Every structure is written in C-alpha cells, then in structure tokens.
Amino acid sequence: MFEAFIYNISVIVAGIYLFHRLQYSENKRMVFSKAYVTVLMTIVSLLLSVYPIPYREDYLIHLTFVPLLFLGRFTNMVYTLSATVIVAIVEIVVFNNSIMYGVTLIVIAAVTSAIGPFLKQNDVLSLLILNVVTIIILFGVALVSPIYTLSEVIILIPISLIITLASAITFVDIWHFFSLVNRYENEDKYDYLTGLGNVKEFDRHLNEISRKAEKEHQSIALLLIDIDGFKDVNDTYSHKSGDAVLKQMSQLLKNYVPNQFKIFRNGGEEFSVVIHNYSLDQSVKLAENIRSGVEKSSFHLPNKEVIKLSVSIGVGYLTDDDPKSQRKVFKDADDMVHVAKNQGRNKVMFNPIINL
C-alpha cells in the first residue's frame, strides 16, 4: 500500500513538473495553455489508473480523479469532460472497471469544472474544496451503488486530501518559480505588471523606427499617454488598486492601437505608442479614440469599487521630410502632455497647439 501511495504522489508531481517544463521550453514566456494542462493531466490520470492503492484484498483506492480536479480549476468544462471521457473509457475497457465508475468520474468532472474556475480562494484552497466536493459525490454514489461502501469512501478521504494538497502546493510553487525565471529573463524588455514593453525597450524601438523612417522617408508619431489623477487612486484606495488600473489600461490600449504599432509602459502611469507611416490626422484621431475610450470605460478595483478615469495625451509628429530625431519627437510629445495637463486634463494636444 505504501509503495502504491508513493507511486501515485510521484506520478502527479512529475506530471506537474513536466507540464511547466514543456510549457517554458516551448514558449519561453510562460503563457498558460489549457491544451497543455489537459494533455498532461490526462496522461497523469491514466498513469494513476495503472497502479491504484490496494486496501484490503478486495478494494483498490483509485485516485484518477485528482488530476481532473486541476482541469476543473484551471481549464473549463469542455477540456475537463473531454479528458474525463478518455480516462473513463480506458478505465472501463482496459482495466475492467464498471460503467458506473466511469459515469462517476464524468459526474465529478462536470461538477468540479462548473464551480472550479469561479472559486475566489487561492489555487491550493480551491483544489482542496474541489476534493471535498468530490468526496461528497462519492458518498452519494456509495448510497445508491455497490461500487463503493461508506467505509471505503471514508478511507479515501485522508489519502485524497494529502495527495491533492501535495499536488496543489507543488503546482503553485513550480508555477511561481518558472514565472520568476521568465520575469528575470525578460525584465530587460518587458514591464512585468502589464506585459508591455518597458522604457528600455521603448528607447530601442523608437530609435529603430526613427532610423527606418529616415531611410524610407516615412513619417513617425509618438503618443505619450498619462493617466490623470493616478496618484489619487494609489492614495485613496491602495497600490494594489493602482496596479489593477494599470493592467486594465494596458488592455484598453491594446484594444485601440492597431497591431502594427507597439505600446509601452514608460513607468508610473505613463504609456506610449510609437507610430510610423501615419498622417498627422490619423495619429491625432487614434489619440482621440484612446482618450474617448478611457473616458467611457469603467475601471474595476480589487475591493469591487468601480471608478472613472481620464488620460491626457501629447502627440509628437515628424513628417516624412523632417529629419528623424528621436529626441525631438519625444520632446514634442512630452511638451504636449504638459500642455494638456495645464489646460484641464482629459485632452489630446499636438503642435501647433490645437486641442480636441
């Protein structure tokens, strides 16, 4: 029994590590993949089917449902049920388990995937809650079906809780570790909070676009976007609320800025967009769309409060005939941001000084 217990824990932990390792090697940027976690946890569940934990001569403790709890938490019902159907078929056809056992697995998958993604607790506690839900389902099955007895389900409780807890802690710990590695390797280019390019990458990119525009006789424009009254958000609510606002602002900018242009967080509450081969009119219209979009949007804070914000935007612009000076286009945009602030905020300003 002890050997089987160790095997079950080892298989789950190894599967969790393999998921993170393959994910990191494949993407380098640790983008969470539901497909990856589904494939890996399905394989882990099948491996657990091979070596159930023996308890007495006539009873085996099956822990194939434990990896399915991870699917219920981290994916959705489609992924979870798809994996569970595969596991159930293998259990019935290959390992001669009853059809009722397969149906029980599917019921567990349906229930846990219906509630798992919506649990507000941290991941470890959420997985333990899903384990308790599973035990309740198994108690119900024991009352109506002979595949379990109440005493067998009771024996399952401590074993499943220990394995679920160990697996959950391992999953979260390895995820945090690889996330820190990814952050360290990319901190020279990316802002860790928003995922946008940072100020170093902004300087490199603006310099590169300036050289390209000079060579190909293209125009360049720079939008500097500053959140109005952002300090008040931090002071009134919390820095955590400020971080939430910055994340939502970065997503809003992605929704408005065309894919061919790059967005950066320059630091604090300032963002920038580098534009090339656009007319001044097109650049100003893009800035106005962003300003208007922010004004109409609601920003949700961690304490459930909703606030309204505005931005001041300065536009720096060099025509296709102008010498392409990185310093000049930045200074023009920066000057216009200050003009927008001084004239009441929530404005788009460009040179010559005209506000929209």
UniProtKB/Swiss-Prot annotation:
The membrane topology noted for this protein in its Swiss-Prot or TrEMBL record is: Multi-pass membrane protein
What is the native source organism of this protein? Answer: Staphylococcus aureus (strain NCTC 8325 / PS 47)
Q: Where is the GGDEF domain?
A: 218-353
GO MF term (any one)? phosphorelay sensor kinase activity
Major subcellular location class? membrane
What are its GO cellular component terms? plasma membrane
Q: Where in the cell is it found?
A: Cell membrane
Q: Which GO terms describe its biological process?
A: cell adhesion involved in single-species biofilm formation; cell wall organization; negative regulation of bacterial-type flagellum-dependent cell motility
Which PANTHER family does the annotation name? DIGUANYLATE CYCLASE DGCM-RELATED (PTHR45138:SF9), REGULATORY COMPONENTS OF SENSORY TRANSDUCTION SYSTEM (PTHR45138)
Q: What is this protein called?
A: Uncharacterized membrane protein SAOUHSC_00760
